[in-house]
C-alpha cells in the first residue's frame, strides 16, 4: 500500500474520533487523547498569542468556556488531506462580559505528526 494512503487513512481515523468526541461535548478528552505534548495552537493574528503545550491549551479552553455562553454549536467534518484535517464550527454564542450575542463561523486546521495533533490553526469570522 502507498505510504500516502496509510497516512491519509491514519489521519482519517484520528480525525473522525476527534470530531466524534467534540460532538459529544468531550473536547477536553479529545485534546488529551490527540494533542501532542508540545502542541501549538494559533488563533488569527492579534486575537490572542499562540499557546503551546497541553496545559496551555486546556487553560485556553477553560478561558473560552468561561467567557462565552454557547447557545448552539454545529460541527462539520472532518475533511482530510494527507496528515491534515479541517473541522468547521458554527457557533451561536453570547460574550458574557458584554452580553453581545453573535454567530461565529470558525474553521480549525489540524496537522498531525507521529499520530498526534502537533498544530491547530484557527480561521474565523463573526457577526
List each model region and its residues:
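Terminal "cap-and-tail" regions of soluble proteins that handle hydrophobic small molecules
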Residues: 1-24, 33, 55, 116-118, ...
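Short, cysteine-centered beta-strand-loop-beta hairpins and adjacent loop/turn segments enriched
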Residues: 66, 93-103
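A short hydrophobic beta-strand element
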Residues: 82-91
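Short beta-strand edge/turn micro-motifs at domain boundaries
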Residues: 105-127
Amino acid at each position: 500500500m502507498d505510504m500516502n494512503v496509510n497516512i491519509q487513512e491514519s489521519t482519517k481515523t484520528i480525525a473522525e474520533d476527534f470530531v466524534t468526541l467534540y460532538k459529544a461535548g468531550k473536547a477536553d478528552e479529545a485534546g488529551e487523547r490527540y494533542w501532542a505534548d508540545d502542541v501549538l495552537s494559533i488563533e488569527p493574528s492579534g486575537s490572542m498569542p499562540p499557546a503551546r503545550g497541553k496545559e496551555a491549551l486546556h487553560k485556553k479552553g477553560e478561558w473560552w468556556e468561561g467567557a462565552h455562553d454557547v447557545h448552539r454549536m454545529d460541527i462539520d467534518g472532518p475533511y482530510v488531506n494527507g496528515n491534515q484535517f479541517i473541522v468547521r464550527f458554527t457557533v451561536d454564542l453570547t460574550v458574557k462580559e458584554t452580553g453581545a450575542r453573535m454567530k461565529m463561523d470558525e474553521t480549525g486546521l489540524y496537522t498531525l505528526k507521529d499520530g498526534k495533533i502537533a498544530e491547530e490553526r484557527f480561521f474565523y469570522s463573526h457577526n
